[in-house]
Amino acid sequence: MTQVPPVTFQQYGPVITTSAGNPVDDNQNSVTAGPYGPAILSNFHLIDKLAHFDRERIPERVVHAKGGGAFGYFEVTHDITRFCKAKLFEKIGKRTPVFARFSTVAGESGSADTRRDPRGFALKFYTEEGNWDMVGNNTPIFFVRDAIKFPDFIHTQKRHPQTHLHDPNMVWDFFSLVPESVHQVTFLYTDRGTPDGFRHMNGYGSHTFKFINKDNEAFYVKWHFKTNQGIKNLNRQRAKELESEDPDYAVRDLFNAIAKREFPSWTFCIQVMPLKDAETYKWNVFDVTKVWPHGDYPLIPVGKLVLDRNPENYFQDVEQAAFAPAHMVPGIEPSEDRMLQGRMFSYIDTHRHRLGANYHQIPVNRPWNARGGDYSVRDGPMCVDGNKGSQLNYEPNSVDGFPKEDRNAAVSGTTTVSGTVACHPQEHPNSDFEQPGNFYRTVLSEPEREALIGNIAEHLRQARRDIQERQVKIFYKCDPEYGERVARAIGLPTAACYPAKM
């Protein structure tokens, strides 16, 4: 199957009915006792209509609540079978159907698309080995490297528990006390933090993963999706204008482009690292606050992602889409990245809360191309897939034709783990300041650095003085000019950047 089949639904008939299919004679007036009397409880159509309306909303995503999506396909253009045995990569020209969802992170479902925020970049590949979910962002790094910090970080991006307002003190207090965040903070406060819609941004898996080839050789890998529309960003003035003029700017732009057959596409590339390199590499390769410089591990092209079909119904496909980093096919495995390990639990857990135990039965989440036997996943609220009929719900058994284990799907077993069970800080002889300093000096042009300073200053100047002083010291450690320019922009003396004298 080369594309996701559209969801079938019963077309409207000529007569309005209740949810039970009974014809409705009057949809404009309730049944009452006389023309001015009270409504009658036995008016089933009224009760049916109100009761369902009361239950229309489901819990919104705790992060990535606002977004848009589309269907499409992934086509292999280059051979990477020397690295990975996953069947979706098995031959050049092979196409795999895909669903994509793009989003902001911190905003509620009604928030503006152009606010300063990372953008979610999530893909569901419907392969014959089951669904592979690539659940990333438009940034190659993240704010924290251990999932235990994630709830605290997200709380700072949401609303103050007393005022219910967004609070710059919360944001910068956390950033200034968690220096590992500075790489992502620097990226976010460039104009890359306000991309011009979803079509003009890159996507990244961010984490380190593993590829396994047919000979059971393992490699570390990172994913990159490079936009073929070209990178375009909004400056802070234009982003603010669009917040009021067109808060749904990015969702609208994606939908309209596909409707006009201007299909957006991305080139999928990978970085590959031999396992032995990780032992001596200058940075911890499992640290999601770091990148692998392309000079050390260049991009290798793999294929092309194309989005060519809008959803028929937003709630059906986009709102109910459930992505999970734990959804991997044979040949793709997790690494020891702590942030990834936490996400592998949290995403599936929140789907069960938000959509129910049988979220995997929702059409957009089904593994359409896989012929599987998930014999043990039974019952539960809203089970609507036939519940496996009369087939047994235990294994092993002696029934002919019952699904068997696939040893090809076994994990590689290439990781040796030993050590004392304890809370271990991620100690590594590297720096949280070197890469953001290099990004500031060598990646950004002077106009981009000027925009970065202005974007930071506009927000940081709203925080307390002690928080400002902590933060500019962090910027100074990345690059002295960086720290001093931010200090001047928010009205601090440049001496506030310097380490305290002993």
From Swiss-Prot:
The active site is at residues 64, 137. The keyword Metal-binding applies. A motif (Microbody targeting signal) lies at residues 500-502. One of its GO terms (molecular function) is heme binding. Its EC number is 1.11.1.6. Its cofactor is heme. Catalyzes the degradation of hydrogen peroxide (H(2)O(2)) generated by peroxisomal oxidases to water and oxygen, thereby protecting cells from the toxic effects of hydrogen peroxide. Belongs to the catalase family. This is Peroxisomal catalase. It comes from Toxoplasma gondii. The lineage of its organism: Eukaryota, Sar, Alveolata, Apicomplexa, Conoidasida.
